[in-house]
Amino acid sequence: MCDKIFHNLSGKTLVATPYVITKGIYHKSLIYMLSHTEEGAIGLIFNRLVNHVDLKSFFKIKEDKITSQVMVPIYLGGPIEHEKGFFLHSRDYNKNLLLDFHNDLAVSSNLEISEDIAFGKGPKNSLFIVGYTAWKPGQLEEELEKNLWLVMDCSKEFIFAENPENKWHNALKHLGIDEIYFSSQIGNA
């Protein structure tokens, strides 16, 4: 048996193929990979808009800091730890970064960025994402072998595009794939 070559996908985007369960959180999802090592992988789904949230309430910001509500769109990043909030944002904001990527993107998860966004001092572009997705060692590689995911580089312009409903279709177009290709691969029961 041959050893498998490990390719680090940190900073890449996973595009769900129709082989992923047709209902549920991963159907037509796009996942920005935060970390991918031989110990496992972590990512944030960035095209599942679920609601709007008041940053003041979510981060329990004191009244004297922010006096009014600051409503932002909230995205579901995955099925794990929905009480944790992350900002996937442009690199023009660089205070207390959790992760810094070489493609003009960063991740923060602290009170300071939420306050800065509330006061208009935050990053030019950001998505507020709750929860995350994780894989055990070898699990993501197995899913890639089963063609559950396509891998792509994507720009901050793509990630922060206005309409989250079109992002999956646009990702397929970017990869040169027509969704019709998959329709012949999936049959009826």
From Swiss-Prot:
Signal sequence bounds: none
UniProt xrefs under InterPro entries: AlgH-like (IPR003774)
Pfam short name (any one): DUF179
SUPFAM superfamilies (UniProt xref): VC0467-like (SSF143456)
Assigned GO CC terms: cytosol
Family: Belongs to the UPF0301 (AlgH) family.
Name listed for the protein in its UniProt record: UPF0301 protein RP032
Organism listed in the record: Rickettsia prowazekii (strain Madrid E)
